[in-house]
Curated annotation (Swiss-Prot):
Subcellular location per the Swiss-Prot or TrEMBL entry: Cytoplasm
Gene: trpS
General function of this protein: Catalyzes the attachment of tryptophan to tRNA(Trp).
A Pfam family the protein falls into: tRNA-synt_1b
Organism annotation: Tropheryma whipplei (strain TW08/27) (Whipple's bacillus)
GO BP annotations, alphabetical order: tryptophanyl-tRNA aminoacylation
GO MF annotations in UniProt: ATP binding; tryptophan-tRNA ligase activity
Disulfide bond residue pairs: none
Name listed for the protein in its UniProt record: Tryptophan--tRNA ligase
Annotated positions binding L-tryptophan: D143
Positions with a binding annotation for ATP: Q19, P20, S21, G28, N29, G155, A156, D157, I192, K201, M202, S203, K204, S205
Length: 335
């Protein structure tokens, strides 16, 4: 069964996505988003978007972005996003995202966009910032509302953006009549932290590479990064983000990878040294990442296969998106 055979049915829609600005996914991406999204594919109509338009808020090398998009697509598929179950599409291939973003930009007030915390944080750190960064949440709202998304997986850093989406949907509905489904947050409580600085999220742009487990890391790298991860001097395995952030981070990783609860993991390692947990976690991570890396490399050996998946899925996404645009334009009187 190929992506062209996916049947849009009455299941609730879940939309998620990832920016391909970096060609490397890390453990935070996998445990915080991809793993749980993969499990939704049988119970929901799932759209997974490679958000390359969002990547343009900061300058990109065109060839690098093009290559990274294929690499990220391969890693997502290898990590469990099944193109036979999900519509895995390229944002830029669905022009209706920009059409609806213009409409929503005229529903959103300047003050609402300016209050977005992520914009204020990033604009405070950068010199010359683009208007695209300012309107990023409006494009995100368009991404979500185009497909009548019932649920959107969000982390803490995106909750404000989703709330703006909900506000814009309700405002449009109030003014023009029922048009948009108001999406609900599917809160992602899993948060993976930097191995060397467990006060901050694991990131592709960490201060040091040793703080991040990339899904394509070699087994040796994975073992070294875990064994050298920051803990504390107590050598007592427990979960407490305030007093034991380092070991708590490792406990969460182990729990997510083994489907144990936090409490179960703490009980398993009660009375054991940190080195035992680190060794076991390293073994599990090596197995998981090696499987993903092997499948990624197989996919990258035939990039045309990946492109075909994206082209086919994007065509299907355009068909769904156009129905929304038709509905919106009719309400606005521009059809």
């Amino acid at each position: 069964m190929t992506s062209s055979a996916i049947r849009i049915n009455k299941k609730p829609v879940v939309l998620s996505g990832i920016q391909p600005s970096s060609g490397m996914l890390h453990l935070g991406n996998y445990l915080g988003a991809l793993k749980s999204f993969g499990r939704m594919q049988d119970d929901y109509t799932t759209y997974f978007m490679l958000a390359n338009l969002h990547s343009m808020t900061f300058p990109q090398n065109p060839e690098v972005l093009r290559e990274n998009t294929i690499r990220i697509a391969a890693q997502c598929i290898a990590a469990g996003i099944d193109p036979a179950k999900s519509i895995v599409f390229l944002q830029s291939d669905v022009y209706q995202h920009n059409q609806l973003a213009w409409v929503l930009g005229n529903v959103c007030t300047f003050g609402e966009a300016a209050r977005m915390t992520q914009f204020k944080d990033k604009s405070g750190k950068q010199g010359n910032i683009s208007t695209g960064l300012f309107t990023y949440p409006i494009l995100m709202a368009s991404d979500i509302l185009l497909y009548d998304s019932a649920f959107v997986p969000v982390g803490a850093d995106q909750k404000q953006h989703l709330e703006l989406t909900r506000t814009l949907a309700r405002r449009f509905n109030a003014q023009y009549g029922q048009t948009f489904l108001v999406p609900q947050p599917f809160e992602c409580s899993i948060r993976i932290y930097d191995l060397q600085d467990p006060a901050v999220k694991m990131s592709k742009s960490s201060a040091t590479e040793s703080g991040t487990i990339f899904l394509l890391d070699s087994p040796d790298k994975i073992v070294k990064k875990i064994m050298r991860s920051v803990t504390d001097s107590e050598d007592v395995i427990g979960y407490d983000r305030e007093t034991k952030p380092g070991v708590s981070n490792l406990v969460v990783m182990y729990s997510c990878l083994t489907d144990c609860t936090i409490e179960q993991t703490v009980n398993i390692y009660s009375g054991k040294k940190y080195s035992v947990l680190k060794k076991d976690l390293s073994d599990i991570l090596v197995e998981v990442c090696t499987t993903i890396a092997t499948r990624t490399n197989e996919l990258l050996d035939d990039k045309n296969y990946i492109r075909k998946i994206l082209v086919t899925a994007s065509e299907q996404a355009r068909g769904v998106a156009q129905k929304t645009i038709d509905r919106v334009y009719e309400k606005l009187g521009v059809y």
